[in-house]
Amino acid sequence: MQRIETRKVKVGSVYVGGDSRVTVQSMTNTDTRDSKKTIEQIKKLEIAGCDIVRCAVPDFDAASSLSEITKNVKLPVVADIHFDYRLALEAIKNGVSALRINPGNIGSKERVELVAKSAKEKNIPIRIGVNSGSLEKDILNKYKRVCSEALVESALNHVKILEDVNFNDIVISIKSSNVQMMIDSYRLISKEVNYPLHLGVTEAGTIWRGTIKSSIGIGTLLSEGIGDTIRVSLTGDPVEEVKVGREILKTFGYLKSGVEFISCPTCGRTSIDLIKIANEVEKRLEKTNKSIKVAVMGCVVNGPGEAREADIGIAGGKGEGLIFKKGEIIKKVKEENLVDELMREIDNM
């Protein structure tokens, strides 16, 4: 899949844009002032496969905690700043790898210059985060409504503020809870600038609804070569955001590592408790780091036949099942032992 070429920026040890891989981001939902809990959550996100993590910085206590946080985690930390430019300066001083701000809401040009200068000295990029819920009044008055054109104009205005103070290590996000508006906005902005784009559907919802909306929005753009880093916004454990984000990237071939898991939807031919088996296999595969494709199929029609491309899998029978590798049957196993035998074979691969 051909990606649209963008400028490359460095976020801590991670590159975003250019020829670098598409990365997965998340945001902590702990109180940043509680450095212990925030560090614990970031470490869980790292284990899940997160590449970059963002922390809210609502006040100076939170900004001060960033010093302890950044010293004790491996992931690059992005400080999420609104309104007070001094929080951005404090965050930079305390070791963050990037800022997320809207230059237009942190004050005068002089204040923007101070933030940009400080970020430039530390080689820290700035993400301009435009959101459909926080458009400027003059833009809303111009368009009379929130729309893709309005969001893009807001983003370009913020870009110009930074460019005017000679700052170009920029990442852009234009998020909306309306999936079609989000898609249209990124399509438009990708034609206007070559800065890396951070994809996401804001306020996407709970794990179920949010996964659907994010997969459609982010997936559509990735299929068109648009996007350099992604964040799946979910109401829930941030680790789930990372899991969903990584699966989206796997689907489009942007992430080759880790297990790809497939299973059939079951039908009248299914004679084993495939739903229970599939859920158990999927859960146990979370601890597997091997880059393999695993299939759990309800009958011999779907597996090993239709699942021939899988590295290993199960095909159900009546009270028993077949374990196959690359379409070749290797053993017949009783239903109650299927999962254990499958995992044993995977461990030996």
UniProtKB/Swiss-Prot annotation:
Keyword line: 4Fe-4S, Iron, Iron-sulfur, Isoprene biosynthesis, Metal-binding, Oxidoreductase
Protein purpose: Converts 2C-methyl-D-erythritol 2,4-cyclodiphosphate (ME-2,4cPP) into 1-hydroxy-2-methyl-2-(E)-butenyl 4-diphosphate.
GO terms, biological process: isopentenyl diphosphate biosynthetic process, methylerythritol 4-phosphate pathway; terpenoid biosynthetic process
Cofactors (names): [4Fe-4S] cluster
Family: Belongs to the IspG family.
Gene name of the record: ispG
Name of this chain's protein: 4-hydroxy-3-methylbut-2-en-1-yl diphosphate synthase (flavodoxin)
Binding site for [4Fe-4S] cluster: C264, C267, C299, E306
EC id: 1.17.7.3
Major enzyme class: oxidoreductase
Pathway(s) annotated for this protein in UniProt: Isoprenoid biosynthesis; isopentenyl diphosphate biosynthesis via DXP pathway; isopentenyl diphosphate from 1-deoxy-D-xylulose 5-phosphate: step 5/6
Reactions catalysed: (2E)-4-hydroxy-3-methylbut-2-enyl diphosphate + oxidized [flavodoxin] + H2O + 2 H(+) = 2-C-methyl-D-erythritol 2,4-cyclic diphosphate + reduced [flavodoxin]
Cofactor note: Binds 1 [4Fe-4S] cluster.
Record InterPro entries: Dihydropteroate_synth-like_sf, IspG_bac, IspG_bac-typ, NO2/SO3_Rdtase_4Fe4S_sf
GO molecular function, one term: iron ion binding
